[in-house]
Curated annotation (Swiss-Prot):
It is found in: Cytoplasm; Secreted; Cell surface. HAMAP family: Enolase. This is Enolase. It comes from Myxococcus xanthus (strain DK1622). GO terms for biological process: glycolytic process. Keywords: Cytoplasm, Glycolysis, Lyase, Magnesium, Metal-binding, Secreted. GO terms for cellular component: cell surface; extracellular region; phosphopyruvate hydratase complex. Mg(2+) binds at residues 242, 287, 314. It catalyses: (2R)-2-phosphoglycerate = phosphoenolpyruvate + H2O.
Amino acid sequence: MTEISQILAREVLDSRGNPTVEAEVQLAGGARGRAAVPSGASTGEHEAIELRDGDKHRYLGKGVQKAVKNVVDVLAPALVGMDAADQFAVDQRMLELDGTATKGKLGANAILAVSMAAARAAADAHGLPLYRYVGGVQARTLPVPLMNILNGGAHADTRVDVQEFMVVPAGASSFAEGLRWGAEVFHALKKILKGRKLATGVGDEGGYAPDLPANEEALKLIMEAIDQAGFKAGEQLFLALDVAASEFFDKGSKKYKLKGEGKEYDSTGLLEYYRGLSERYPIISIEDGMAEDDWEGWKKLTDALGSRMQLVGDDLFVTNVERLGRGIETGTANSILVKVNQIGTLTETFDAVRMAHRAGYTSVMSHRSGETEDTTIADLAVALDCGQIKTGSASRSDRVAKYNQLLRIEGELGAAARYAGKSVFRALNQKK
C-alpha cells in the first residue's frame, strides 16, 4: 500500500553548518522515505525561495523551524491519505497549498523535502531503487562527472573570479574509471599546489581554493595536473567552467568586472575572452557565461560559441520551464543545469529536463554548495538520463556520497550500464 500515513520533519545541518529541512514520509504498508534538501551559495534571482526563520539569536537567522512547522502543520494534514506513488498529485497539492510562484509562503525547502521523501517512500513500497522507480526499465546511463577541483568566485575568498574549474573525464569507458581519473588529477593538483606553497585547503564543494593572480593560472595548473597524473588533456580529460557571471555583472554599467584581474568587459568582450580561452585549452562546457538577465549577451554567446561547446544555463534558467522555454524559443544556451531546490518539486524538475531534451538541449544534474549526505540527485541523474552530473570534487563526504551512490548503481546495472562519455558533448562528436 502506498497511501501516506504520516509525515515528519526536522531541522538538520548541511555541509556548511547551516540548518536545512529533512522530511520523512511513512506509508500505510510500512514503507518509508527520508530526504534532506540542499542550499546554494550563489543563488539565482529567480530561484524558488527557501524559508529561513530570521531569528538572529539562533543559527544567525538561518534556522528553518518555520519550514519544519509548515511541513508538520500544513503539508502533512493535507497529504495524509494521498497516494505517494502519484508524484504529480502530491506535488500539485503542495503547490496549491503554497499558492505563490516562488513557493515563498511555505518555503521551497519544506515542499521539496516532502516531494523527495514521498518518491523515496513509493520506491521503497515497490521494492525498487529510486533511479529505477523514477526512470523505469530504460534508466541505465551513468553521467559524466564534472568535477570541481579548483574554486574561485563566491565559493572562495580569493582573487579568482571564475567560480568553478572542472575536469571532465569524458574519454573514460565507465563511470568508475571516470571517477578514478578525476580523483587522480585532484591528488596531482594538490601535489603541485604544495610544491608552489599554495593553499591546499578545500572549499564548500571540495575543490582547492588557492589565491592565484588570474583565472588563466587556474587552467594552467589543472592542465599540469592532468599531465602529471598521466592523462591526455583534450583526448581523455577535458575542462569545464562555471563562471557564475551574475556575481560580477554590474547592472548599472552593464559591464562584467573581473576584479581579480582588474579588467571589465561588455558582453561582446567577455565572449571573446571565452573564445580565447577555448582556443588555448580543451574547454567543452561553460556555465553561466553571462548574467542571469543578460539575454542579449547570452544570445551573442550562443551564436558565437554554441556550435563548439556546451553553454549551460543555471541562474539563467533556474530549472524553470518558463525561463527555459524562453531560452529554447530564442536559441539561447544549449544546456540546462538541474537543481531540484531551484524549483522546489520533483514534478517540476522532471518537466524541465524533459522540455530540455525535447529541444535538443543537454541537462546537467547538480548539487548545491550546502549539501547533506542525501544522494537523491545521483539517482535522478540516472533516472532522467541527464548524462552529466556536478557534485563537487573527490573530497568531503557530502560530495563523495553522490559519487559512491553512482558507483553502486553502475555495479547493480552490471553489463546493462552505459557511460555517457563523449556522446553527450556535441562538440566532441563533431570532432570525430
